[in-house]
Amino acid sequence: MTIDEIIEAIEKLTVSELAELVKKLEDKFGVTAAAPVAVAAAPVAGAAAGAAQEEKTEFDVVLKSFGQNKIQVIKVVREITGLGLKEAKDLVEKAGSPDAIIKSGVPKQEAEDIKKKLEEAGAEVELK
């Protein structure tokens, strides 16, 4: 029996049959199907902060302040988000609040590009 045939056979099982299969595999091999819980000693604070920064792959672009040129910042926000004029203006006016997220869950490079565009327009931006 090939691995593909085994997978096909498993796909045809009902939920109760799958539960029974898991139980028998646990008993046979002396293992558990529970998700492993990672327990590690607390690393040195400086090393932990550096590692956390490196591991982060998605960022939120947060508007801290629109600076002196609100109109230009609104134009850039519209360009980035595709929002209408009123929605972009409302978002820019939330600057400094937790709701002032221009874009969330974006890759690092895109987040940095957005930050650069907004800063060129005079805004103060933070990546979270």
From Swiss-Prot:
Coiled-coil regions listed in the entry: none
Gene Ontology, cellular component aspect: cytosolic large ribosomal subunit
GO biological process assignments: translation
An example molecular function term from Gene Ontology annotations: structural constituent of ribosome
Keyword tags: Ribonucleoprotein, Ribosomal protein
Stored SUPFAM superfamilies: ClpS-like, Ribosomal protein L7/12, oligomerisation (N-terminal) domain
Function: Forms part of the ribosomal stalk which helps the ribosome interact with GTP-bound translation factors. Is thus essential for accurate translation.
Family designation: Belongs to the bacterial ribosomal protein bL12 family.
Quaternary structure (record): Homodimer. Part of the ribosomal stalk of the 50S ribosomal subunit. Forms a multimeric L10(L12)X complex, where L10 forms an elongated spine to which 2 to 4 L12 dimers bind in a sequential fashion. Binds GTP-bound translation factors.
Alphabetical list of PANTHER family matching this protein: 39S RIBOSOMAL PROTEIN L12, LARGE RIBOSOMAL SUBUNIT PROTEIN BL12M
Protein name: Large ribosomal subunit protein bL12
Organism per entry: Thermotoga petrophila (strain ATCC BAA-488 / DSM 13995 / JCM 10881 / RKU-1)
